[in-house]
Amino acid sequence: MSNFRVQRYHSSDSNHWNTFVANAKNATFLFHKDFMEYHKDRFDDYSLMIFNVNNKLVAILPAHKVDSVLYSHQGLTYGGLVLSSKVILSEVILITKCILEFLEKKEFSKLNLKIIPSIYNCFPSDEMEYICFLLEAKLSRRDALAVLDITNQIPISRVRKRGIEKGKANGLVVKEENDFTSFWNELLIPNLKERYNTKPVHSLFEITYLKSKFPNQIKQYNVYQDDKIVGGVTVFVTDNVIHPQYISGNKAFNNELGGLDFLYHYLISNVYKNEKYFDFGISNENQGKQVNESLHYWKESFGARTIVQNFYEIEVKNHSLLDTVLI
């Protein structure tokens, strides 16, 4: 008989779920149900909760289903198995086996995981990387993230310094704002439409709603020249990591005004100088198989260096491979 029990998440579990997220060793506010459910109409939620023999919640899996595949999570930047800091490797192996057996009974064929990058963890949390190896999981994608260690910075390049000085010479001013309207409507939406014929993942209504739920985790910084908005960035703040979620500016912002260099330097050197990591994000295309070289170099010229985020495809039936691991 298993020492763990798996059950589907239900709306009545929200407080229990959110309390667990707040104390887990590898979670951020993106796993809070107030964040996950802003777009619940787009996904068929199939999140899981795992309890031990004492009926204590020890792990959760933010997830949704598409046919016979369970994803964790296509609607989030990252996903994977979220763990209590008290669980140890042997328990995580048994928890994973229990999850896969549960999914097999529910006639799932695959579990796809989008692992949370290590910098977001509060404690070492590579259990699932090891377990994916044990399960002979397919590494379906690997992205390269450019990350700056704010506490131990590699010197910024001379090119970036020139951009920063250009921003100062052009009289640029950065202000934190609570209203996203001007940035969204005047810059972000038009630019995404013109360049990529797409829209922001979050609508103005959605980002405003999320800001109301997470006022300390979602921040907006606009850049002004002569009181006119010329650029801006929407930042997601987690315990260890500062991550620009959206960045946009007018046609003069990047080159003529030095706005992008000026804005990022301001955030790193002033607003978030006491934080741990600044995650510039990925520069990948084609499911991680190609890198936008100039974009990644721009991030590296701030002193950022590369870590990876792994995506795994697990065959549910392979749970038997975990039977003989513990000796």
Which positions does each model-derived feature cover?
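A conserved beta-strand-loop-helix scaffold within acyl/acetyltransferase catalytic domains
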Residues: F4-N54, L61-V69, P117-D143, V147-F253
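Short, flexible, mixed-charge acidic loops at enzyme active sites
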Residues: V69-Q74, L295
